[in-house]
Amino acid sequence: MSLESTLTDICCKRQRHLVRLGFARATGDVLMILDADLTVPPEDLPRFYDALVSGKGDFINGVRLVYPMEQEAMRLANLIANKFFSLAFSWLLGQPIKDTLCGTKVLWKSDYERIAAHRHYFGDVDPFGDFDLLFGAAKQGLKIVDLPIRYRDRTYGTTQIQRWKHGVLLLRMAIFACRRIKFV
């Protein structure tokens, strides 16, 4: 295994771990995720908060695939994979999901605690934590609402997704979840 591959694996696991650690230590009632690469500006978070507290949904999920993106924001292969997973998740979860891997998500802490308590149901192999949260939210009967954002070019860091390696892993997770949700 190359050093670059090892570092990418550490970063992915670290991202998932840091989100979980932050959520565990949070003292407020509302939990928010915003990726550090600033592809979504922090100024968008009040829209997510408003959608949650107004009761529009229980789990507010960012969507990068509605508005035109800046030129370098997402590679074509990633865009195609995102659209595939969106269709698969919409069918699988029985509610429309337009973007499964947007890092911007907002939910109630009490709902997250229920998701975390039942995480074992889908396994603990999600390298980024997005599928884990979406599967858990659907399993807990939460209303997932997509909220479009304007996706920008990365201003910090590099992508942590290795499209083929992680794409295959995410596909395996979706198939596993399909057996747990649709064919129980």
Predicted region positions:
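Catalytic donor-sugar/metal-binding loop of nucleotide-sugar-dependent glycosyltransferases
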Residues: 122-123, 134-151
